[in-house]
C-alpha cells in the first residue's frame, strides 16, 4: 500500500468550533493511525485477520470508553472527542473502528450505565486498557431489525441463571473476554447479562468468507445451558430500551466514523487526480472530475456540521434517538457514495490494494447495514416526524 499522505479537508474552518482538547485528541489519534494502522491494515484485510497488536495502541489513544469517567479507567472526555476519535480510526479502517465502537458503546457503556458498582469496578478498568475485550449480543439468526422478537432466554435456577440461545454477526466475538448478552427472562422481559469466556456451554465460532470488514473479527455467540452467576445481571435498566440506548451511542460514533472514511477517499482521489496525466493534463483539470470532487467536499462538509451539532446536543443531554439515527443514515450514505465515485476516479488502480478506496467501499457496505439498516433509519425518522409507526 502507498504511504499515508492524508491531509484532512476542513472547507468551512470547523477547527474553530473545536476546543484545544478536541484538537489534541483528534491529532493524537490521527498520527497513531498513520503510524500504526495505515502501514499494516491492507495486509490484514487481505488475510481477513484482525491485527490484535494494535489493541494496546487503541487503548493508549483513548479509543476504549473515552467518555467513561476516570474513576473507572476512562478518559472522562466529552462526546465530540469520542466522535473525533472514531472519525480518525475509521479513516484508517471501518473494521478497526468497529472494534473500538463495540468496546466503548456496546460493552463499557451498558456496564457504566446499567451495571452495579461492583461490575463497574471489576470490568471497566480492564476494558479501558484493552486487557479485557468485549462484544455485544443482540442480533439473532431470525431477529435482526426486529430485536424484540429475540428467543435467547434465561431461567432463574435459584443460585444462578441458565442461558440458552444464539446471537450472530457479532463483532469481536472470536476473541472477546466478555459478552454483553441481551436475553428474555421467564416473563419475556429483556435483560442484559455479562457472560465471560470460559463459562461451560459458551462458544464463539468465527464467521468466515466476508467481503467486508475483513480486518474485523466477526462471529456467533452460542449459549448451551450456560450457568451465569446472578451477580452478572445488569440491574440498572431492562426492556428493549436498554440495548437501544447502547445503539444510540454506537450510531453516534458511526456518524463520525463514516466522515473519516469519506475524507480518506476524497483525499486520495484529489491527490490522484492532480497527479494523473491524460490528454496532456491532470485529470483534475477536467469538468467531470472537478464536479465529482466538488460534490464530495460539499457532502463531507455538510456531514461534518451535522456530526458536530449532534455532538453538542449529546454533550447537553438533548440528542434524541431519531436525531442520532438521521446522522448515522445520512453520513454513511454520504461516505459510500463518495467511496464509489472516488474508486471510479482512480480507474483500474482503484480496485487494487495500493489504495484504500476499495477497502473503504467494501467496508461501508457493512456500515450501512449494521447498528440499524439504512431503511430502518428512514423508518425511525418517518415515525418521529409523523408520530405513526410503519414497522409493521
Residue ranges of predicted features:
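Alpha-helical interface subdomain recognition
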Residues: 1-102, 114-119, 126-131, 146-147, ...
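Short Ser/Thr-interspersed hydrophobic loop/turn segments at strand-loop and sheet-helix junctions
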Residues: 62, 86-90, 183-185, 195-200, ...
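Helix-loop "lid/cap" segments that line or gate small-molecule binding pockets
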Residues: 105-113
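Short Gly/Pro-enriched turn/cap motifs at secondary-structure boundaries
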Residues: 127, 142-145, 169-172, 184, ...
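A short, Trp-centered hydrophobic/proline-enriched beta-strand micro-motif
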Residues: 130-138
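Flexible, small-/acidic-enriched active-site or ligand-binding loops
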Residues: 149-150, 198-229
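A short core secondary-structure module
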Residues: 159-160, 164-204
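Long, acidic (Asp/Glu-rich), low-complexity accessory segments flanking structured domains
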Residues: 224-242
Amino acid at each position: 500500500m502507498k504511504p499515508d499522505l492524508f491531509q484532512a479537508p476542513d472547507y468551512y474552518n470547523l477547527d474553530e468550533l473545536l476546543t484545544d482538547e478536541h484538537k489534541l485528541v483528534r491529532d493524537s489519534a490521527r498520527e497513531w493511525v498513520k503510524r500504526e494502522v495505515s502501514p499494516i491494515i491492507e495486509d490484514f484485510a487481505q488475510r481477513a485477520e484482525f491485527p490484535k497488536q494494535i489493541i494496546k495502541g487503541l487503548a493508549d489513544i483513548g479509543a476504549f470508553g473515552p467518555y467513561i469517567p476516570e474513576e473507572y479507567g476512562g478518559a472522562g472526555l466529552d462526546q465530540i472527542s469520542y466522535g473525533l476519535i472514531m472519525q480518525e480510526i475509521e479513516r484508517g479502517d471501518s473494521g478497526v473502528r468497529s472494534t473500538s465502537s463495540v468496546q466503548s458503546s456496546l460493552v463499557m457503556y451498558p456496564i457504566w450505565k446499567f451495571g452495579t458498582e461492583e461490575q463497574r469496578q471489576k470490568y471497566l478498568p480492564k476494558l479501558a486498557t484493552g486487557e479485557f475485550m468485549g462484544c455485544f449480543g443482540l442480533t439473532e439468526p431470525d431477529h435482526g431489525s426486529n430485536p424484540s422478537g429475540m428467543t435467547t432466554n434465561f431461567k432463574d435456577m435459584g443460585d444462578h441463571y441458565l442461558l440458552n440461545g444464539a446471537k450472530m454477526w457479532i463483532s469481536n466475538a472470536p476473541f472477546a473476554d466478555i459478552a454483553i448478552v441481551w436475553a428474555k427472562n421467564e416473563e419475556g422481559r429483556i435483560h442484559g447479562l455479562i457472560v465471560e469466556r470460559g463459562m461451560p456451554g459458551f462458544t464463539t465460532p468465527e464467521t468466515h468468507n466476508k467481503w467486508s470488514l475483513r480486518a474485523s473479527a466477526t462471529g456467533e455467540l452460542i449459549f448451551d445451558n450456560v450457568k451465569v452467576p446472578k451477580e452478572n445481571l445488569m440491574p440498572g435498566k431492562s426492556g428493549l430500551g436498554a440495548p437501544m440506548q447502547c445503539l444510540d451511542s454506537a450510531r453516534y460514533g458511526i456518524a463520525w466514523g463514516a466522515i473519516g472514511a469519506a475524507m480518506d477517499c476524497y483525499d486520495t482521489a484529489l491527490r490522484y487526480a492532480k497527479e494523473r496525466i491524460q490528454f496532456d493534463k491532470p485529470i483534475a483539470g477536467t469538468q467531470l472530475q472537478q464536479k465529482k470532487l466538488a460534490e464530495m467536499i460539499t457532502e463531507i462538509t455538510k456531514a461534518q456540521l451535522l456530526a458536530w451539532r449532534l455532538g453538542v446536543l449529546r454533550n447537553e443531554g438533548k440528542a434524541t434517538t431519531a436525531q442520532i439515527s438521521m446522522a448515522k443514515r445520512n453520513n454513511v450514505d454520504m461516505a459510500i457514495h463518495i467511496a464509489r465515485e472516488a474508486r471510479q476516479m482512480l480507474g483500474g488502480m482503484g480496485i487494487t490494494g495500493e489504495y484504500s478506496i476499495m477497502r473503504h467501499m467494501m467496508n461501508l457496505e457493512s456500515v450501512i447495514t449494521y447498528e440499524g439498516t439504512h431503511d430502518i433509519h428512514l423508518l425511525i425518522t418517518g415515525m418521529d416526524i409523523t408520530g405513526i409507526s410503519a414497522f409493521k
